Amino acid sequence: QQGISLPYYGILDGKIISEATAILDGSIAQNSDGLVDEKTAYLSAFRTIPEYQGKGYFSKLFRYMLEDLKNRGYEKVTLGVEPEETENKEIYFHYGFTEHIKNGVESYPDGTTIEVEYFGKQLSH
């Protein structure tokens, strides 16, 4: 049986230093139409502790996550990024997230809203 999300953690010397989540069920993701289905996972919640940023730890976790999802039978992964986050967009493009799927608006529990661009990548088998 498949869960609704799959967390990934980067651990160094017993300490979680980075994390990401693969959303496997659209019922827990905003704007999920076209982003999540039985063969597509939506990637979110990317975090790295500041003192470990820029050292390649998250890249290693990200590559592992993509390979693991491919091995689990997923054919595509998607993610969202705010349009002004140009540095992150360049990183995602580098990883092959070049298919623009759609634009949308996401909201937080406090009422804050953000514009988001959604991109996809095919996982090669």
Where are these regions (language model features)?
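Conserved acetyl-CoA-binding loop of GNAT-fold acetyltransferases
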Residues: 92-102
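Conserved beta-strand in the GNAT
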Residues: 9, 15-26, 30-31, 42, ...
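Conserved acetyl-CoA-binding loop-helix of GNAT-fold acetyltransferases
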Residues: 48, 54-67, 93-94
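Conserved beta-strand-loop-alpha-helix junction that forms the acyl-donor binding cleft
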Residues: 79-89, 106-110
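Conserved GNAT acetyl-CoA-binding A-motif
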Residues: 69-81
